[in-house]
A protein has these predicted regions:
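Secondary-structure boundary/capping micro-motif
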Residues: 1-68, 72-115, 119-156, 160-171, ...
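Conserved tryptophan-centered aromatic signature that marks the ligand-binding surface of SH3
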Residues: 175
């Protein structure tokens, strides 16, 4: 709402002045806090088109679903996350007064009023209601309320609502997420397709999507979704997921759907058909003439019934149905026998296969005794036979099932009561809890010795060493590891969380719905192509599609994870796929939580989800892929670091640093070929097909969504370029703008109206020779003050030089302002600084990859010839090596003469 619409809304609600001021303050204020995920919560931000800002959520299954509902609810005018906190007071379970500041999840403005909303699961509310009965209460109607919050809201004539996950329909929410690319975005649809679909639906109302696509060859799933989003077709979004084409029914309008649905319900209720085929199943308990019978077989011609005692009988099915329809035979209500049935069920569940086999043998003999087949039980002792018959009849009379009376009772024999002294046993348990299960991680032998000393001091008999270790083994493994070694060590034994309720799929319903991004340091040592010098291990950035497990982007660099790696990963993704993911799953790394990164995701309507720290199972898709990359590719190359993981067994013959032959460019070439071709076409056990096949089929089912394609052009590249922490720079007359200690100039700065004004700025972290400024409604290219020195230099190299200068000034106790000339002079003498030289070598290796990515239109970048810059740098490297490291005698390697491994020919 704009200011005029807000005033009209306040006038309609007849709000008091202080209430209007409060709402205005909430509307103008940023979120009062930044959400953080707890141990099992996935938090993140959602780019709201309705609000024009990003909305935070602390739970991706409750709060995020609520955001989706409010985003598409026409009754919701505005909603704000994390509004300003207010103080609440209540009593806890012990009756103690508690007061603290509380921040609700949302403040929502609707057509009929405004309210604070707190969203939680029912299970969580039940626990909180026991702990804080004065704060959360469950009403008789099943609704939850918060009296302290309501008391605060009543002061302003507003409401405070406690909302639960029970109000969220998983299927409806899932369909909203599925249609998010079509809601609010323009999409092209020809009139011929619209007319053909509507005409066919009028003739065949309620047809499924699968049947419609099979009949109309010129219509695809993408067209159907566009018509649903634009309300040209009606689908009950709360019925079934849209991706299930064989179940999703289409209608011309909601009125048409309601009319056919009502007619079908009436026809079913009025149709006089016997209900027996759907209600009568084998082992169904029936009541006939006050006697209990069991339905053994319900056949087409005859039906077999078994009485409580006696022999089974057979009735013609037609006659049986007449008795059933007339009510003479009816289904037995087992409510009164719930206790008996529960006892029988417990006895049957606890019986072992050996016991069941023995009971079956006894049952056959007892049945032969009832039927007077003496030849079957003639070898059985008469006294034993009478005992079995008695056990059968007693169980039949008391439990209604004589079979359980024949189950062996050998497991109940013997004295099962504990024989150890109570004092000794309790003291042993105490020592295990207080001395063994502690972060001290004391050994079992030392704890047992302390236990024996304590028993001697108390003059009681200690339990044996064997009993002590048996008690240790019976303790829960997860809890014991948690107390001794901490949460990370115990995470491996933590039980899995199984989704048993109807929920959204954890890996999405379509390709590019959920994409994981993460970094890892590859287990391989690399050399410089120019000098043969060891450069260390590279960092790998991967983006993978959770739905199809397809690798979407691969990026290699020597730099530690930063926003530069994130930017390049997203650039490669858009270059190869032409799409931006709907949801990006990240970890807690600081490179994923910068303002620049969040702005980039919001710009392309991407929801960011943050995995809980120390819980790798939340990112199992990409964590497993890192392991696959190592085992299937990296570990087959020379210079892999498997041997160095056991340093005590490392020798020169297997030292990865001695065996290293790969350079960054060659490794990237073959790594992309493996990721985009080999892995992509291999069979995946979890999918039952290859990632490429699943990805392609997923696009055909979920729609290509061509209207959401992103062009890999200068506009996109500019959006991926970072800005400074301030975001703006002042145009200094004659100098231009200053970015990262450097001045940049453009002829656009000659305009007097631009001088001494703040303009938005961006820069290329891989080329500090240029920067960009937003002047007169367009981005202009600016040249560095010392362009010849800084062109091709990365941001990290310049910042490293600045750090070196600060360190030198600190040692000499001098204070020198960092400026472009000082930095240029310092970098020009790079041969005297090995740290800068190594960074330069790494940056030049990475520069080759960037040139390939920007110049090649193919998916698999190729390795170009070495530039002349490497020859100059090789001479500098030899000088540095001879001056600083004379003992190494590293000779340049001619990698072009090295043999290529057979598997990559």
């Amino acid at each position: 709402m704009n200011e005029l619409e807000f005033k009209d809304w306040c006038r309609e609600q007849q709000l008091a002045t202080h209430t209007i001021d409060l709402i205005a303050q909430i509307r103008e204020s940023p979120p009062s806090r930044r959400v953080q995920g707890r141990t099992k919560n996935v938090c993140g931000v959602y780019p709201s088109s309705k609000m024009g800002v990003t909305i935070q959520f602390e739970s991706h299954t409750v709060e995020l679903w609520a955001i989706y509902l409010m985003e598409h609810d026409p009754q919701v005018l505005e909603f704000y996350d994390q509004p300003p906190p207010f103080k609440i007071q209540y009593k806890n379970q012990a009756g103690r007064n508690i007061g603290h500041y509380h921040t609700p999840d949302f403040f929502v403005l609707r057509h009929d009023g405004a309210c604070w909303e707190e969203w939680k699961t029912v299970k969580e509310l039940e626990k909180l209601a026991q702990k804080y009965p004065g704060r959360y209460q469950n009403t008789a109607s099943g609704h939850w309320r918060c009296p302290p919050g309501e008391a605060h809201a009543s002061q302003f004539g507003l409401k405070y609502c406690v909302r639960t996950d029970a109000e969220l329909n998983p299927v409806f929410t899932q369909n909203l997420m599925f249609l998010s690319d079509y809601l609010g975005f323009k999409s092209n649809l020809t009139t011929d397709v619209t007319h053909s679909v509507l005409a066919y639906l009028k003739a065949n109302p309620g047809i499924t999507i699968a049947a419609l696509l099979q009949e109309l060859n010129d219509v695809c799933a993408n067209d159907i979704y566009i018509m649903i989003a634009t309300e040209l077709l009606y689908v009950d979004l709360s019925a079934v997921p849209l991706v299930e084409h064989y179940r999703t029914r289409l209608w011309v309008s909601q009125q048409n759907h309601d009319a056919y649905t009502h007619a079908s319900v009436v026809s079913v209720t009025t149709k006089n058909t016997p209900s027996s085929p759907t209600t009568l199943l084998p082992n169904t308990a029936l009541e006939w003439d006050s006697a209990l019978w069991t339905l053994v077989n319900y056949g087409e011609t005859t039906t077999t019934l078994l009485p409580e005692s006696g022999f089974p009988i057979q009735l013609p099915t037609v006659f049986f149905l007449q008795l059933f329809d007339s009510g003479t035979i009816k289904i037995h209500n087992g409510v009164t026998d719930a206790t008996i049935n529960e006892t029988v069920r417990t006895l049957m569940e606890t019986a072992s296969p050996v016991h069941l086999k023995e009971a079956n043998r006894k049952f056959n003999i007892v049945q032969a005794y009832f039927q007077r087949h003496t030849d079957i039980y003639q070898d059985i002792n008469p006294r034993t036979l009478r005992r079995w018959v008695q056990q059968f009849r007693e169980a039949e009379a008391s439990l209604g099932c004589g079979y359980v009376g024949l189950l062996p009772r050998t497991h109940q024999q013997g004295n099962r009561q504990p024989k150890s002294p109570t004092d000794s046993s309790e003291l042993l348990d105490k020592f295990i809890k207080e001395h063994f299960e502690t972060p001290r991680q004391a050994t079992g032998a030392s704890v047992y010795r302390a236990y024996v000393r304590a028993c001697t001091a108390l003059n009681i008999q200690p339990l044996s060493n064997r009993t002590f270790y048996q008690r240790l083994k019976k303790r829960p493994t997860h809890e014991q590891t948690l107390k001794r070694q901490g949460a990370k060590a115990a995470y491996a034994t933590e039980p899995f969380v199984w989704e048993l309720a109807l929920n959204t799929r954890p890996h999405g319903n379509r390709p590019l719905e959920i994409v994981h991004i993460d970094h890892t340091e590859l287990d391989i040592e690399l050399r410089s192509l120019a000098t043969g010098r060891l450069l260390g291990r590279p960092w790998l950035t991967l983006l993978t599609d959770a739905y199809s497990r397809r690798i979407l982007a691969v990026y290699l660099t020597f730099d530690a994870p930063s926003y530069r790696s994130c930017m390049m990963g997203l650039r490669i993704l858009v270059q190869r796929q032409g799409r931006f993911p709907s949801t990006l799953v990240v970890d807690g790394g600081k490179e994923f939580h910068s303002i620049y990164f969040d702005t980039l995701l919001a710009r392309y309507h991407c929801t960011k989800k943050t995995r809980p720290g120390g819980k790798p199972r939340f990112g199992s898709v990409i964590e497993r892929l890192f392991g696959t990359t190592n085992t299937e590719f990296i570990y087959n190359l020379l210079g892999n670091t498997q041997a160095s993981k056991q340093p005590r067994q490392l020798t020169k013959t297997v030292d990865p640093k001695q065996l290293a032959v790969w350079n960054l460019g060659d490794l990237y070439t073959y790594l992309t070929q493996w990721a985009y071709s080999i892995y992509d076409s291999n069979y995946h056990d979890s999918l039952g097909a290859s990632p490429d096949v699943v990805y392609t089929e997923g696009l055909s089912i979920a729609g290509e969504r061509l209207h959401r394609r992103i062009a890999y052009n200068e506009e996109f590249l500019m959006a991926t370029r970072p800005s400074t922490p301030k975001g703006q720079a002042k145009v200094q007359p004659g100098y231009g703008i200053k970015v990262n200690y450097l001045y940049y100039w453009s002829d656009a700065f000659r305009n007097p109206n631009v001088e001494k004004t703040l303009v938005p700025v961006r820069y290329d972290p891989f080329d500090m020779g240029v920067a960009y400024a937003y002047v007169d409604g367009r981005w202009v290219r600016c040249i560095s003050q010392y362009y010849s020195t800084f062109v091709g230099r990365t941001e990290k190299e310049v910042l490293l030089a600045a750090q070196e200068i600060r360190q030198l000034n600190k040692r000499s106790a001098t204070a020198t302002n960092l400026n472009a000339k000082h930095l240029a002079d310092f970098i020009a003498n790079v041969q005297e600084h090995e740290a800068l030289l190594l960074q330069r070598l790494r940056d030049l290796e990475s520069k080759r990859l960037l040139d390939n990515l920007t110049s090649s239109n193919s998916s698999d970048p190729s390795v170009n010839q070495v530039h002349s810059t490497f020859a100059v740098l090789a001479q500098q490297s030899e000088d540095v090596t001879s001056q600083h490291v004379p003992s190494r005698n590293v000779e340049p390697l001619d990698l072009s003469s090295l043999p290529i491994l057979a598997e990559y020919k």
